[in-house]
């Protein structure tokens, strides 16, 4: 079967857009072909900085004929109706129609229409111009002489050529002719911009990829990535060093080169006095280079690794020299930031009111930066006030949390008032991703307690499902307070996540709170701390009066379900223990854990079956309007099974309630498991729907006691199975 090769070659595509663009090309083309009636065996996309390529294998040469039967009017219909039918069906005369008979409706005309299939080449030529014109680039531009015309092509960078060939492996391929803005599809591409700029004639994918490789273009991005990673590790190893792995940088650099060549440069060792994080980001952000270190060491070496797109005649000496000059200049700037951040600010007198407000020591550089942050009224959010106001709110929440968690209040308060100070440092101004990290370093330099320095860095954590969770009590209190203020604040101004949109990362903040509580094994009822957060906010913004606690708690429940589900818990078991007012996340998780263990054991499965039978009977009766009593009358018992079940329920309920009081949910489940046998015997021996209405009502009340007893630990009616 024929194969289809498409290449869209342009000026350099931004690295961050390449992978998605190639995927978009594959989806748009294959969807259009399938919609037109074609099928294919497989498709794979490729990309380099200058081209998007699509290889479609086993594409039908022609779409199948479509047969359609169109029903017309009765044979005795008027002439106007018949003429309309002929026009709609595309028939020249009524003699071309068939007559069908229906016992009820009589004879009527039917047109058998055959829509012939189309050649795949015609379909491709038809769909490709629209796909190219409407391509979903995040940003695009017009270029060339055609750009002055209305409706001219927009592409991420100027589009230079289009390859589109079609044909079976056993025959010569054909160019599918179409044009977009004066660019006509052909079988001509070009290799590396510098090493092989000559035109290359290609036939099908294997030939295309092979010729590009000879023209210094590695088409497969994953292979380029492997080459860069392996060569970088090897050159580091050869110099007695190890590469500091950076998957994000590796992905970006892969999108910057078509013919990767890995080289090593160096800078003066004196720059190693700068924190490693600053060195790494300086070299990564500005020069797209990797850093190295001694094997097993934390600190960096003065060697960096760069990736070139050309094979230089001098072995890369000039490239290394040029990159080294830029790296040294950038590191010189970074050293300047680092030293300035440790010095005094020039306007300390004006910072005294802010210093008094937060108990800051203006003799210390980090305290000065916090005072400056407050004095400048730097906005956190237009509706939520300044960063200084936010720090004041976080302080209130963190001190309340410290009372519950047992964290040292003085250390918590000191951590909070310095937590955002590094936002006014030059290092964080240059590299915002270092916030918290630089605060930690400056705190250590000015002699802060280790718990304070750690809390400054850790209060942003965890920032995702795989990020480390702070375990120190001070760090945990500040991290929780920071996130609770964020969530309560944005809920109060009705800036909640909607659908896939979450501009303030509130889902991540809620997950952070959940992980801090569960992984820290912290007993922390959320509702009281929502109140603390809202009270702190309303002290500053009295106009924010809405009650958001119930809605915010429901949001936490949703995120908790996702978190527990990712850990393997069943949704139905989570729902079974979750009530709308439950705000102790650790207790919810423990209940789910205990219920999971119980319900997967034989005793639990059997009790579940009996309990569900009881709740179903009760639900049916209550739907009819029957009121089920919450007490039973032992005088109405007629069978031993009733008496035994009643006694067992009382004993199991007492034991379960006592275990729950001790927060021993496994023992509570074990107590309930003793109901299994008496419940089974009851349903085997007792007819609930007795003719005597009093006995029937009493037996329904007995079923109600089963529901109440099991309801102490979970709503068994929500458990599937």
From Swiss-Prot:
Enzyme class: ligase
Keyword Nucleotide-binding tagged: yes
GO cellular component, one term: cytosol
Main location per the UniProt record: cytoplasm
One MF annotation (Gene Ontology) recorded for this entry: arginine-tRNA ligase activity
The entry's keywords: Aminoacyl-tRNA synthetase, ATP-binding, Cytoplasm, Ligase, Nucleotide-binding, Protein biosynthesis
The keyword ATP-binding is assigned to this record: yes
Documented EC number(s): 6.1.1.14
Localisation per UniProt entry: Cytoplasm
Record GO biological process: arginyl-tRNA aminoacylation; glycyl-tRNA aminoacylation
Pfam family, one: tRNA_synt_2f
InterPro entries linked: DALR_anticod-bd, Gly-tRNA-synth_bsu, Gly-tRNA-synth_heterodimer
Reaction(s) catalysed (UniProt annotation): tRNA(Gly) + glycine + ATP = glycyl-tRNA(Gly) + AMP + diphosphate
Family listed: Belongs to the class-II aminoacyl-tRNA synthetase family.
Quaternary structure annotation from Swiss-Prot or TrEMBL: Tetramer of two alpha and two beta subunits.
Protein name in the entry: Glycine--tRNA ligase beta subunit
């Amino acid at each position: 079967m024929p194969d289809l090769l498409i290449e869209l070659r342009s000026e350099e595509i931004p690295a961050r857009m390449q992978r998605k663009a190639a995927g978009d090309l594959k989806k748009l083309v294959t969807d259009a072909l399938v919609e037109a009636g074609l099928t294919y065996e497989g498709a794979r996309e490729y990309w380099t900085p200058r081209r998007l390529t699509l290889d479609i294998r086993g594409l039908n040469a022609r779409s199948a004929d479509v047969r359609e039967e169109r029903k017309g009017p009765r044979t005795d219909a008027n002439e106007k109706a018949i003429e309309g039918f002929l026009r709609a069906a595309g028939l020249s005369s009524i003699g071309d129609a068939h007559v069908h008979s229906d016992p009820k409706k009589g004879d009527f005309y039917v047109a058998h229409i055959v829509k012939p299939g189309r050649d795949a080449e015609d379909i491709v030529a038809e769909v490709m111009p629209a796909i190219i014109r409407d391509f979903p680039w995040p940003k695009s531009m017009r270029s060339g002489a055609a750009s002055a015309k209305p409706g001219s092509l927009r592409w991420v960078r100027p589009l230079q050529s289009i390859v589109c060939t079609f044909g079976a492996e056993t025959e010569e391929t054909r160019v599918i002719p179409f044009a977009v803005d004066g660019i006509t599809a052909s079988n001509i591409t070009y290799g590396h911009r510098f090493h092989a700029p000559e035109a290359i004639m290609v036939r099908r994918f294997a030939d295309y990829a092979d010729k590009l490789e000879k023209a210094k273009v590695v088409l497969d991005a994953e292979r380029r990535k492997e080459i860069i990673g392996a060569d970088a590790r090897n050159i580091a190893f050869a110099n007695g060093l190890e590469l500091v792995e950076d998957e994000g940088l590796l992905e970006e650099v892969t999108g910057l080169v078509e013919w990767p060549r890995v080289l090593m440069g160096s800078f003066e060792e004196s720059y190693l006095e700068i924190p490693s994080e600053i060195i790494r980001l300086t070299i990564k952000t500005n020069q797209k280079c990797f850093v190295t270190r001694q094997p097993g060491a934390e600190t960096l070496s003065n060697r960096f690794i760069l990736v070139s797109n050309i094979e230089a005649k001098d072995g890369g000496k000039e490239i290394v020299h040029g990159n080294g000059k830029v790296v040294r200049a950038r590191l010189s700037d970074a050293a300047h930031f680092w030293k300035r951040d440790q010095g005094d600010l020039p306007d300390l007198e004006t910072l005294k009111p802010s210093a008094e407000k937060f108990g800051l020591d203006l003799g210390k550089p980090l305290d000065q930066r916090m005072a400056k942050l407050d004095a400048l009224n730097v906005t956190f959010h237009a509706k939520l006030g300044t960063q200084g106001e936010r720090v004041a709110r976080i302080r209130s929440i963190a001190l309340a949390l410290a009372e519950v968690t047992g964290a040292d209040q003085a250390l918590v308060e000191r951590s909070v008032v310095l937590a955002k100070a590094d936002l006014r440092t030059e290092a964080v101004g240059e590299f915002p991703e270092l916030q918290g990290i630089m605060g930690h370093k400056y705190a250590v330099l000015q002699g802060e307690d280790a718990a304070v320095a750690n809390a400054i860095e850790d209060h942003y954590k965890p920032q995702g499902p795989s990020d480390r969770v702070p375990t120190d009590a001070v760090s945990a209190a500040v991290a929780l307070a920071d996130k609770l203020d964020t969530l309560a604040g944005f809920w109060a101004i009705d800036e909640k996540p909607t659908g896939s949109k979450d501009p303030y990362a509130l889902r991540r903040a809620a997950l952070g709170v959940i992980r801090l509580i569960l992984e820290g094994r912290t007993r922390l009822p959320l509702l009281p701390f929502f109140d603390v957060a809202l009270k702190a906010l309303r002290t500053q913004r009295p106009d924010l009066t809405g009650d958001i606690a119930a809605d915010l708690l429901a949001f936490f429940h949703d995120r908790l379900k996702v978190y527990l589900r990712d850990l393997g818990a069943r949704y139905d078991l989570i729902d079974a223990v979750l009530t709308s007012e439950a705000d102790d996340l650790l207790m919810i998780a423990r209940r789910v854990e205990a219920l999971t263990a119980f319900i997967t054991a034989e005793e639990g499965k059997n009790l579940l079956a009996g309990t569900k039978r009881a709740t179903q009977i009760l639900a049916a009766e209550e739907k009819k309007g029957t009121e089920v009593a919450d007490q039973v009358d032992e005088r109405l018992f007629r069978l031993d099974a009733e008496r035994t079940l009643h006694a067992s329920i009382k004993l199991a309920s007492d034991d379960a309630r006592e275990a729950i009081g001790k927060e021993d949910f496994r023992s509570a489940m074990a107590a309930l498991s003793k109901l299994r046998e008496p419940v089974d015997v009851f349903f085997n021996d007792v007819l609930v729907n007795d003719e005597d209405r009093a006995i029937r009502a009493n037996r329904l009340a007995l079923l109600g006691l089963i529901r109440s007893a099991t309801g102490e630990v979970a709503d068994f009616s929500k458990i599937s199975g």
